């Protein structure tokens, strides 16, 4: 079982003994227990285990008790804190002073004791000390004996906790570059200062010859390889598609069989490089058994590798998927072309949702007029205002087929613990593995092809690095859509019929970047996007504010935005205030 950070609950209280404190002990501790129960009952880690909470041993009224609580949280592996109170407390004495923990304070809205007054006072202290905290204050007054958590308060607590757990989970992990810069793509020029200062992560790197060395020297689990090949023969190789290469570039059957064996070994080795494998230690490879402690990774592929060896499409697709030959499991985060910036966006989405993430080129905006000109047909329904073609060289998660279904029977991408074996088989059945286009991939290999089902709510994200400014985040909520099959066939074949397609329509609004579908495409900051199931823009914005990464483009309603209270001091324009606050506070780990 993986070890995850915990969320610390800090019940603060009026320190005046002799009647005041005593009358509040039970109430304050009950609120803390209610918050812990809310989080544990509603939030899970990537492996499906509940997010754990640690409550201080007692209420916190004076600074010595704050210190004792801090010591306990360090021992217990806490990564974020929520302070809870129903009354006045001594702000600077009782506040969380850890500079690395995301922090929130819930001040109970009641009349008998001034929890709201403490909330305002301690948030002023957090702002004054440069330790931003999220303020949580219920809209409606509650009675003193009411220990329930109102819906608006619960929503903010869970939004904070979800993002805070993501921050804490990233801290101390690695991003593994397998290879280096791919085709001059800026996102694959990995910036270690960003990872260290903003995410608390380190960067690891291997030359791609390490994969060949492990193949040649047998540094992989042979039993697992045999199991993996049998599974691949049953579920993937049987769905091998037509070879569209010209005869001179078409591989023989024997060569294709060798490619299948190669890419399966490659997948096992890439996973071992990320997380290690105790089986390798049993085989005598102690160093290789350790792995790189990578929570995300990227594979360069093009061009040096793919000009000579089978491409990484199968390996990337399977690792990004919530299942493989070992069964249903948490998806990994692996980027095509070692695009670390997109990898970070994928990681954000994965940690916030516990779901597999789609990696795609933001390839083409198709206007209704262009579609009519090319196909003679009109886009209809949700696609009527134009569509964005999300497509990449076969490396997209197979969860992206949309063959999983939610409780309402709608297409979905689900956390691994909700996926059924039947849904796994449907995802595999919906995927064709085409021999790689050898104009692009001279070394061969296989690329996945599928068409995502329409009707899934999704959020497309991208992290970009801007010289002189730093990291910025883009967010576009929308939906996958289905279009007339004849239109799809014509548009797909003039792009690349061996790669997977997701047709995307963003939700439009009165913001300039979202006035129409074209504007979303035109304002996108790079060639790739990370697509997560669900409308999670508000959670991404909360996470970005914790990491001090401004959001330059989003279509989230303003009343859904939840950032630290200190952001209110930077002006009434929310986007401008976000930039000013992020610049003022700077990265957490600098």
From Swiss-Prot:
Residues given in the record as Mn(2+) binding sites: 337, 361, 528
Domain of life according to the entry: Bacteria
Record flagged with keyword Metal-binding: yes
Location(s) in or outside the cell: Cytoplasm
Coiled coil feature spans: none
Cofactor(s) for this UniProt protein: Mn(2+)
Gene3D superfamilies xref list: 3.40.50.1070, L-fucose Isomerase, Chain A, domain 2, L-fucose/L-arabinose isomerase, C-terminal
EC number(s) per entry: 5.3.1.25
Keyword Lipoprotein annotated: no
Biological role: Converts the aldose L-fucose into the corresponding ketose L-fuculose.
Name of this protein: L-fucose isomerase
Protein species of origin: Bacteroides fragilis (strain ATCC 25285 / DSM 2151 / CCUG 4856 / JCM 11019 / LMG 10263 / NCTC 9343 / Onslow / VPI 2553 / EN-2)
């Amino acid at each position: 079982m993986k070890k995850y950070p915990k969320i610390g609950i800090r019940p603060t209280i009026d320190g005046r003994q002799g009647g005041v404190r005593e009358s509040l002990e039970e109430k304050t501790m009950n609120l803390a227990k209610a918050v812990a129960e809310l989080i544990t009952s509603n939030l899970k880690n990537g492996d499906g285990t509940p997010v754990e909470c640690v409550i201080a041993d007692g209420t916190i009224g004076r600074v010595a008790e704050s210190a004792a609580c801090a010591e306990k949280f360090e021992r217990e592996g806490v990564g974020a804190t929520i302070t809870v109170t129903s009354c006045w407390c001594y702000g600077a004495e009782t506040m969380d002073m850890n500079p690395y923990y995301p922090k929130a304070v819930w001040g109970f809205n009641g009349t008998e004791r001034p929890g709201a007054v403490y909330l305002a006072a301690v948030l002023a202290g957090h702002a004054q000390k440069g330790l931003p905290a999220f303020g949580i204050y219920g809209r409606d007054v509650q009675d003193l004996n009411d220990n329930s958590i109102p819906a608006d308060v619960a929503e903010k607590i869970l939004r904070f906790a979800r993002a805070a757990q993501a921050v804490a989970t990233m801290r101390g992990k690695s991003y593994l570059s397998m290879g280096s810069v791919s085709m001059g793509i800026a996102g694959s020029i990995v910036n270690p200062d960003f990872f260290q200062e903003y995410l608390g992560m380190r960067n690891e790197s291997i030359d791609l010859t390490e994969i060949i060395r492990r193949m040649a020297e047998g540094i992989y689990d042979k039993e697992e390889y045999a199991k993996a090949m049998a599974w691949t023969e049953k579920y993937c190789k049987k769905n091998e598609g037509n070879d569209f290469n010209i005869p001179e570039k078409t591989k023989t059957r024997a060569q294709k069989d060798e490619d299948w064996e190669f890419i399966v070994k490659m997948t096992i080795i890439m996973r071992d490089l990320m997380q290690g494998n105790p089986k390798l230690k049993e085989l005598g490879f102690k160093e290789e058994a350790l792995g790189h402690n990578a929570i995300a990774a990227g594979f360069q592929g093009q061009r040096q590798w793919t000009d000579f060896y089978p491409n990484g499409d199968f390996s990337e697709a399977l690792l990004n998927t919530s299942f493989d030959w070992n069964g249903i499991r948490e998806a990994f985060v692996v980027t095509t072309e070692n695009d670390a910036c997109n990898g970070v966006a994928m990681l954000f989405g994965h940690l916030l949702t516990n779901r597999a993430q789609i990696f795609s080129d933001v390839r083409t905006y198709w206007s209704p007029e262009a579609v009519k000109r090319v196909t003679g047909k009109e886009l209809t329904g949700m696609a009527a205002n134009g569509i964005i073609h999300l497509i990449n060289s076969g490396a997209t998660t197979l969860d992206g087929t949309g063959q999983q279904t939610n409780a309402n029977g709608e297409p979905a991408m689900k956390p691994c613990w909700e996926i059924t074996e039947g849904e796994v088989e449907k995802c595999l059945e919906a995927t064709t593995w085409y021999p790689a286009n050898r104009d692009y991939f001279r070394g061969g290999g296989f690329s996945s092809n599928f068409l995502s089902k329409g009707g899934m709510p999704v959020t497309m994200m991208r992290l970009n690095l801007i010289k002189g400014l730093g990291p910025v985040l883009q967010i576009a909520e929308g939906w996958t859509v289905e279009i007339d099959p004849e239109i799809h066939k014509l548009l797909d074949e003039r792009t690349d019929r061996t790669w997977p397609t997701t047709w995307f329509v963003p939700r439009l609004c009165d913001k300039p970047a979202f006035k129409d579908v074209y504007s979303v495409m035109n304002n996108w900051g790079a060639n790739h996007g990370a697509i997560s199931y669900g409308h999670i823009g508000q959670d991404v914005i909360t996470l970005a504010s914790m990491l001090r990464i401004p959001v330059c483009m989003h279509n989230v309603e303003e009343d859904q935005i939840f950032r630290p209270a200190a952001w209110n001091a930077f002006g009434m324009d929310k986007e401008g205030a976000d930039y000013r606050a992020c610049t003022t506070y700077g990265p957490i780990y600098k």
